[in-house]
Amino acid sequence: MQLYNTLSAKERANLIDQAGEVRLTLSFYKYAQIENPKLFRDYLFIHWDKINVLGRIYVATEGINAQLSVPATRFEEFKAILDNISFLENVRLNIAVEQDNKSFLKLKIKARDKIVADGLEDSEFDVTQCGVHVDAQSFNDLISKPETLLVDM
């Protein structure tokens, strides 16, 4: 089974033009404990390559960080693949406002040490322990307090 791209960027661009279909550009990330990033990488490649997903995805023991495009007609199928992965079920997908069918020309999924170059040592904390979601009013109330420090990443 092929787990890598065989077409050049130019060949892929021509195929995108010939297909004439609208693609959705989107991104998502999720901190989760992935025991075998290389195996997970291969799983994603096998499933996403079948539905013509293109993009740049990083997988590590700490989670996944993805920027990609998917044919609009295959979006529900793509979403179903995500929802079959327990920690990605109902993950928030950030769909780009401006679309470019050629935002990505290849599917590149890389197993890495980290999904974000943040300089932190993951062994010092549990990346799956996240904060509490607050609505807009609560957020505004929190940041209006002088003792609140807001870090925008």
Model feature map: region roles:
Residues M1-M153:
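Cytosolic catalytic domains that perform sulfur/thiol-centered chemistry
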